[in-house]
Curated annotation (Swiss-Prot):
Protein's UniProt keywords contain Transmembrane: no
UniProt xrefs under InterPro entries: Flavodoxin_fold (IPR003680), Flavoprotein-like_sf (IPR029039), FMN-dep_NADH:Q_OxRdtase_AzoR1 (IPR050104), NADH:quinone_OxRdtase_FMN_depd (IPR023048)
MF annotations from Gene Ontology: electron transfer activity; FMN binding; oxidoreductase activity, acting on NAD(P)H as acceptor; oxidoreductase activity, acting on NAD(P)H, quinone or similar compound as acceptor
Function per UniProt: Quinone reductase that provides resistance to thiol-specific stress caused by electrophilic quinones.
Protein name: FMN-dependent NADH:quinone oxidoreductase
Subunit structure: Homodimer.
Entry EC no(s): 1.6.5.-, 1.7.1.17
Name of the gene encoding the protein in the UniProt record: azoR
Database matches in Gene3D superfamilies: 3.40.50.360
Organism listed in the record: Streptococcus agalactiae serotype V (strain ATCC BAA-611 / 2603 V/R)
Length: 213
């Protein structure tokens, strides 16, 4: 099963980060179950991401709609954006690695989504509203780290990264499934308690992520 890991942590190689640990545990499970397959990994803070600015994506999209010629730099940026979209669509399992920063996804996570949430590609507009186009058994597993507890209790309404990604991928793109595994309470709980719960949840989610049902 083609699987793409999208890591949105600015410090993606930090071995002490719970986000990194989550990703490494997922990779261990993947290698156990699919020894003959290779993961694709995209580190958002180690690649070029075209941004929605007047000079880049807004200009490119406007010219493409009007059939106008792109500048040399716009051609490069447009190809990068297209390659990101094609890479995304070619993987039916997406693992989105995301720390919670100020109750939200990181800036580059949003920029990445701007390059793949494209009308006519991953969703379309109709008279009755938008309709998702990612209907061929696409699934997303979100690996989230957070300093407090957001899966339940008084802070659960503020788990905006989960709400946002679920809306984009499941509600608007029509992914078949969206699941979250958390390393939460990292600032208030014993480290081993966090890791034990995380590992248990990850194993359960992994089985469902690759189930044939």
């Amino acid at each position: 099963m083609n699987t793409l890991i999208v890591n949105s942590h600015p410090d993606f190689s930090n071995p002490y980060s719970f986000t990194t640990i989550l990703q490494e545990k997922f990779i261990e499970l993947y290698n156990e179950h699919f020894p003959n397959h290779q993961l694709s990994i995209l580190n958002l803070y180690d690649c070029v991401l075209p941004e929605i600015t007047k000079e880049v994506l807004l200009s490119i999209w406007s010219k493409q709609r009007k059939g106008l010629e792109l500048t040399a730099d716009e051609i490069v940026q447009a190809k990068i954006s297209k390659d990101l979209l094609e890479q995304f669509k070619s993987h039916h399992r997406i693992v989105f690695v995301s720390p919670m920063h100020n109750y939200n996804v990181t800036a580059r996570a949003k920029t990445y989504i701007d390059n793949i949430f494209i009308a006519g590609e991953t969703f379309k507009y109709t008279e009755n509203g938008s309709v998702g186009l990612m209907t061929d058994d696409y699934r997303l597993l979100m690996l989230e780290s957070a300093g407090s507890i957001y899966s339940k209790g008084q802070y659960s309404p503020y788990e905006f990264p989960v709400h946002y990604l679920k809306a984009i991928f499941k509600d608007f793109m029509a992914f078949d499934d969206f699941c979250v595994v958390r390393a939460e309470g990292t600032d208030i709980l014993d480290r081993q308690v966090v890791l034990d719960k995380m590992n248990q949840d990850l194993r359960e989610a992994f089985e469902a992520f690759y189930s044939k049902e």
